Amino acid sequence: MEIARSQNDGIIILAPSGRIDQDTSAAFQAALSGEIAGAAPASVVVDFTAIEYISSVGLRALMIGAKESKASGGKLAVAALR
């Protein structure tokens, strides 16, 4: 899994690619948490266009990110879920 980062009008866009599973979920969670903490309150969009698979562990990482974002007064959105 790789994660591309961009920013548009103050909104951080993270675009992971590949698989988010047991082996990669920690890196995904660290990247997401880092963006949320680094620019709190942050608006973050996670673009799943290039994700082939996300396991329950990956969904857990996303939920942790959502809770962290809410706690810091930010917003987290997801795009292109398949």
Predicted regions: what they are:
Residues 1-15:
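Short beta-strand/loop segment at the start of cytosolic alpha/beta domains
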Residues 20-82:
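Amphipathic alpha-helical interaction surfaces in cytosolic regulatory modules
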